[in-house]
Amino acid sequence: GQKLPSENTLSAQYQVSRQTVRKALAILQNEGYMNAEHGRGTFCSEMMRHAHPSKNIAVVTTYLSDYIFPRVIQGIDDVLTGAGYSIVLKNTKNSRTREAECLQEILSKDIDGVIIEPSKSQIFCRHMNLYEQLEISHIPYVLIQGCFPQMKDKPHVLLDDFQGGYMITKYLADHGHKNIVGVFKADDMQGQNRHKGYVRALQEAEILYDPDKVVWFHTEDRKIHPYEAIREMAGKTLRGRMDAVVCYNDQTAQLVIRALQEEGLRIPEDVSVTGYD
């Protein structure tokens, strides 16, 4: 950080004794606002960077231009702009490494707060130190869409994904479907909770849960695996025994529909397909 003037200079500038200057610097150093380096002088710490409001809010999402994200970002921007704040956009592509890089960059800039969608939120976070540094620097943050397992006590805004997965599966069961396949994302909290809702609805409908009727995919294979797995089921392993598919989201549902149609099945006459979001 910026180097402070000498004790003599500060004493003359503020017309106080050197002893008073030393006491003031000691208090600031103790609070973490200053760092004294032997032989070099006293410097402002990173905390000083955030001591004055910048009216900048960082918004970190997994994606920017795909799927629902443009609408989410637009909604955030409308509220922030109305309150006199500017938005600083970052995206992680659901990568832990990129998330850590975004947080490091935020810590080096004048940012008043952070709205962040955690990457692969079902997996233990290994860069907790960066979130702790936000707190040390008095930068408030809120998690959206997901929450790391060890951060349940931090501010977060989540959908009720369990209830959503439950309701959509119950709807299919109530309409007579008995062979309901599920397609869920394994590395995000949303996918795990939607799957739990799916399981609960099957139990209540007295439909046996079959792990062979559940497709799990990850961020890296999200555009390939659901399509390939459903096509394999429709063409071989479950041919004639699949009457509905509960999908993690609408993007996944589009892949599932294409796979089923390429196997000669009609939607919804032969197989009902549900989306989410």
Where are these regions (language model features)?
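N-terminal helix-turn-helix DNA-binding module of bacterial transcription factors
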Residues: 1-51
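The beta1-alpha1 cofactor-binding region of Rossmann-like NAD(H)/NADP(H)-dependent oxidoreductases
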Residues: 7-8, 96, 162
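Bacterial carbohydrate/catabolite-sensing allosteric modules
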Residues: 31, 78-86, 105-112, 125-277
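Short, ordered loop/turn segments at secondary-structure junctions
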Residues: 39, 92, 119, 146-147, ...
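Phosphate- and divalent-cation-binding pockets in alpha/beta enzyme and binding domains
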Residues: 43, 68-71, 197, 255-256
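Short, flexible, glycine-rich and Lys/Arg-enriched loop motifs at helix boundaries
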Residues: 48-54, 117-131, 218
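Amphipathic helical "hinge" segments at domain boundaries
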Residues: 49-113, 120, 199
